[in-house]
A protein has these predicted regions:
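Short, compositionally biased
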Residues: 1-195, 212, 342-346, 367, ...
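Active-site beta-strand/loop architecture of penicillin-binding DD-peptidases
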Residues: 374
Length: 384
């Protein structure tokens, strides 16, 4: 959990994370203790020609560009009428991974059974209904307990969350604290802080949701979080080995397909897509499975623990990965001992200039007890 005066892991715009001490008031400056940056911009990926890796060399024999895909296993058919707001995702086999990020390599074959998936991210209206019915209080709304944070000054044990707070001038991209602030009173009811509200934003994705919050909602709704493999299979919509959920062109025919950041990150958003932050769900075209915002808008929780070497371990098993549930434990070399879950889909802060993990196969990561104003979720249901 992120608190003023404590070290924290924050999800940044491109789905990467950095470690810093949140010990200043919003708007102040502090140097991060360590930082991670993107390994490759999406512009380089777009410039890649067929038959090349991200580095520009020939495809390896274990990469999809040189292989004809094996026949798909017979996809399952929809078992009856769709639950309200859900779409049927047919089971099948696909290529999972991406060239652009080391933790999304190598490409590997995965099979998932069919399942139902929410067409859209869970909205403020839906989450409010749950909160009223159950009295549930999210992690961001709870006052931290001193025994859970020994050594923290009492004045810093204040409920709140992390909010994107862009500077009014260009800044170097190696100090992410320049555009993130811990805001007392920020939570799903007050996305930008205590003076903000969700009135009139019922159809926007609920944010500032920690993993526990999402799981509790899922149990109430009779659903569950998707696995990372299920999310990516659904995200691709049957378009195997494509760069985006809709194909290989970022703006096919000049059409904007997802809510991402345009302009100069982080200080100047030209809002070419019409939204400076999260957009109402369903504001952009659905994918081939009828799912909205599977790329951009807000990051989404999955049930998998995060390990950057997980894909390699699947490949070394030498068999098709069937319904993978993720690794048994979490490990991030940049933060040994800090458990993290996988995020998928990217957000409204993803940008060509800075990072681009809204591409199909991109991965994010985050501590289970931490939410931000660009992190939400959607749910799935097993066939019955």
């Amino acid at each position: 959990m992120i608190l003023p005066g404590l070290a924290a892991i924050i999800a940044i715009g491109g789905g990467l994370y950095y470690y810093f001490a949140v010990n200043k008031l919003p708007g102040s400056s502090v140097e991060p203790q360590t930082a991670m940056s993107c390994d490759m911009g999406i512009s380089a990926a777009r410039g890649r020609t067929a038959g090349q890796t991200a580095a520009g060399g020939p495809m390896r024999s274990d990469q999809p560009g040189e292989l004809s895909a094996p026949p798909r296993l017979n996809p399952s058919t929809a078992p009856g009428r769709a639950p309200d707001g859900m779409a049927w995702i047919p089971g099948g086999e696909f290529w999972m991974g991406a060239d652009e990020f080391p933790d999304a390599q190598p490409w590997h074959r995965v099979y998932v059974d069919g399942f139902w998936m929410d067409k859209s991210e869970v909205t403020n209206e839906q989450f409010e209904k749950f909160a009223k019915a159950t009295g549930y209080v999210t992690i961001a709304e709870r006052t931290p307990r001193a025994e859970d944070f020994p050594g923290a000054p009492p004045e810093n044990l204040v409920a709140g969350s992390v909010v994107f707070s862009p500077p009014d001038h260009p800044v170097k991209l190696n100090d992410h604290f320049q555009w993130w602030s811990y805001i007392n009173g920020a939570n799903w009811r007050h996305p930008e802080g205590p003076k903000s509200h969700i009135k009139g934003r019922g159809n926007y994705p609920v944010v500032h949701i920690a993993f526990e919050d999402a799981v509790t909602y899922a149990k109430w709704a009779g659903k569950r979080l998707p696995t990372e493999a299920e999310f990516e299979f659904a995200q691709r919509g049957g378009l195997d080995r494509k760069l985006y959920a809709w194909g290989d062109e970022f703006k096919p025919g000049g059409r904007i397909m997802a809510n991402t950041f345009q302009g100069h990150f982080p200080d100047r958003n030209t809002v070419e897509d019409g939204y400076a932050a999260a957009a109402p769900v369903g504001s952009f075209p659905p994918n081939n499975y009828g799912l909205y915002d599977m790329a951009g808008n807000v990051w989404e929780w999955t049930s998998d623990w995060y390990r950057p070497d997980y894909y390699q371990k699947l490949v070394t098993q030498g068999t098709l990965a069937r319904n993978p549930q993720g690794p048994a434990d979490s490990h991030d070399p940049s933060e040994p001992g800090v458990k993290k879950k996988v995020h998928k889909g990217g957000s409204f802060l993803c940008t060509d200039q800075y990072c681009a993990r809204y591409i199909a196969g991109g991965r994010g990561k985050g501590e289970p007890d931490t939410g931000t104003n660009h992190l939400g979720f959607r749910l799935v249901r097993d066939q019955r």
